[in-house]
Design a protein with these regions (language model features):
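Short Pro/Gly-enriched beta-strand edge/turn motifs at strand-loop
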Residues: 1-3, 72-76, 145, 312-321
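A contiguous strand-loop segment
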Residues: 3-127, 147-271, 278-280
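Short, well-ordered beta-strand elements within core beta-sheets of diverse protein domains
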Residues: 131-137
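Short, charged, surface-exposed loops that flank catalytic or proteolytic processing sites
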Residues: 137-143
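Extended, Lys/Arg-enriched charged tracts that mediate electrostatic binding to polyanionic substrates
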Residues: 145, 151-154, 306-308, 316
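Glycine-rich, aromatic-lined ligand/substrate-binding cores of catalytic
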Residues: 223-350
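Substrate-recognition/cap regions that form aromatic- and gly/pro-loop-enriched pockets
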Residues: 308-451
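Histidine-centered catalytic/metal-binding microenvironments
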Residues: 428-498
Length: 498
């Protein structure tokens, strides 16, 4: 639900998934998100930002005038900016040279009680500038949370947002609720979190190293009598209940997506809840070890095989339009950031090893357009540059750019899904097989090469990927158009002799 916050800034609606390293088949840490917008046509570019590109620059947001002087020492990082920087950069997601991954943001809203005493700051930090001012300047996930928290403390926040961080050791989810208050939680190694446009972190343990939080947040809640929890003595501090919302809009637009994530990743937990339960768990254990494709399937879901699928045949007209699905025509891109889990080193040691090229490259699996119709492409983040064909997308439809080819797959597929479903499914299956083989082949080739040659192995691998994935997309689009032409209702049975 893209919406305007109290500050008047445009909000984007997204769905996020975070997976700890003991919950994946290969020990990877995964943070993932769909980037949605108010329109199906808000093109994205994929690029590698060189080290130091904005060092010492005064950054001024095109969205709300937020202004900050950036420090020196910025690292190289990957980014997915909008093609209209004058309206805000919106770099959204990436991995830097120290192998810190960040995805920003998961839009949310705080309730009126807390905003009354700590309102949004009109020209404070918002989604459009968040990745740009944090990711190049941190070397661990915890440093990412810390730097973002310090910026919010100094400049204020223009909106409520959730932010995902990961490194080789851990994943963190940070929720900025009000103008200056926030909480972050480390995702337990054997757990998963699914978030959908609501403040979601539950009980906060202020004595645990698994939580970080804004200075004075407990005093703020106590001073303004904001905690409604029952019980004598020290009452539980449930961040979701104190700062979050639970409205009819949430139960139609947000909560059902979390339930759908549970349905796909922990079905036995989903069975214990209704689609609109307000007490769905923030973190949970999946019913199996997960891979990138499992997380991608969750982000590609449109309530498949349920009565709530808007392009399905189960249920009725009412049920199919009742709840918002995870994947939308308005999804601009979907990403799964994969970082190899490392044991026996500290986060700081991992950062130093990453900067020397000694660790396996993180992978950004990205689907341009709507992920249930577009393939996830494994782009290696240790490449010095990404394929130029993915950069500088045209602001209006242009099939000469990959973004618009992938965007067209959704436009050609979902309106007459009964006609395109089989071909689209076969295409996605074929692309997954090719992508998984490609990622493994490049990964093994790079690790077998001398450290100083690995970056070039990754860059060549990305270039080869771009060639076949774009070519395959063009062929698939042509096949879809032919199928739709043959199935057109604007026809009539003809005499074969004419």
């Amino acid at each position: 639900m893209s919406k305007k916050g109290f500050d008047g800034l445009m909000r984007r609606s997204c769905t996020s998934v975070l997976v700890g390293r003991a919950a994946t088949r290969d020990g990877s840490i995964l943070i993932a998100r769909n980037e949605d917008n108010t329109t199906p046509a808000a093109p994205k570019s994929l690029r590698m930002v060189p080290a130091g590109e904005r060092d010492g620059v005064e950054l001024v947001s095109g969205a709300n005038g937020f202004t900050i002087a950036l420090p020196e020492g910025g690292l190289r990082y990957s980014a997915m900016p909008d093609v209209t920087p004058e309206e805000g950069l919106f770099e959204e997601a990436g991995v830097n040279a120290a192998h810190v991954a960040m995805s920003a943001t998961e839009s949310a809203l705080a309730n009126d009680r807390v905003l009354a005493f700590d309102p949004y700051v009109e020209n404070g930090l918002a989604e459009d500038a968040m990745l740009t001012v944090v990711l190049p300047y941190v070397k661990t996930a915890r440093e990412g949370v810390k730097r973002l928290g310090e910026i919010v403390a100094e400049y204020g926040s223009a909106e409520s947002n959730g932010v995902l961080f990961a490194d080789h050791l851990e994943a963190w989810y940070m929720e900025i609720a009000t103008g200056h208050h926030w909480v972050a939680q480390r995702i337990p190694d054997d757990c998963v979190a699914v978030v959908a446009n609501q403040l979601s972190i539950q009980e906060v343990d202020f004595e645990s190293g698994s939580f970080m939080y804004s200075e004075g947040i407990r005093e703020f809640v106590e001073e303004h009598a904001l905690n409604s929890a029952l019980g004598g003595g020290e009452r539980p501090f449930n961040f979701r209940e104190i700062f979050g919302t639970s409205s009819d809009g949430d139960r139609r637009y947000n909560t059902p997506r979390v339930w759908d994530g549970l349905r796909l990743l922990a079905p036995e937990i989903a069975k214990e809840h209704t689609v609109v339960d307000s007490d769905l768990p923030f973190v949970f254990r999946p019913n199996r070890l997960l891979g990138v494709e499992d997380v991608a399937a969750a982000l590609s879901s449109h309530f498949d095989e349920t009565e709530f699928d808007p392009i399905g045949t189960a249920g009725d007209e009412f049920s199919r339009k009742r709840y918002r699905a995870i994947a939308l025509s308005r999804t601009q891109e979907s990403h799964v950031l994969q970082i190899e889990g490392v044991f026996g080193l500290s986060a700081e040691q991992c950062a130093q090893a990453a900067l020397k090229g000694e660790l396996a490259s993180p992978i950004c699996w990205v689907a341009l357009g709507t992920p249930c119709f577009s393939p996830y492409m494994p782009l290696f983040c240790d490449a010095p540059m990404w394929p130029a064909c993915f950069d500088d997308a045209a602001p209006k439809p242009d099939l000469g750019h990959p973004y618009w080819v992938f965007r067209s797959l959704q436009a050609a597929s979902d309106a007459r899904f009964a006609v395109t479903q089989v071909r689209s499914g076969d295409y996605k299956s074929e692309q997954w097989q090719k992508a998984l083989r490609h990622a493994q082949r490049v990964h093994r080739e790079a690790l077998a090469a001398p450290v100083e040659e690995r970056a070039m192995v990754y860059e060549k691998g990305n270039s080869k990927l771009a060639q076949w994935v774009v070519s395959d997309a063009h062929k698939h689009l042509a096949a879809l158009l032919l199928d739709l032409s043959i199935a057109s209702p604007l026809t009539f049975k003809m005499n074969p002799n004419l």
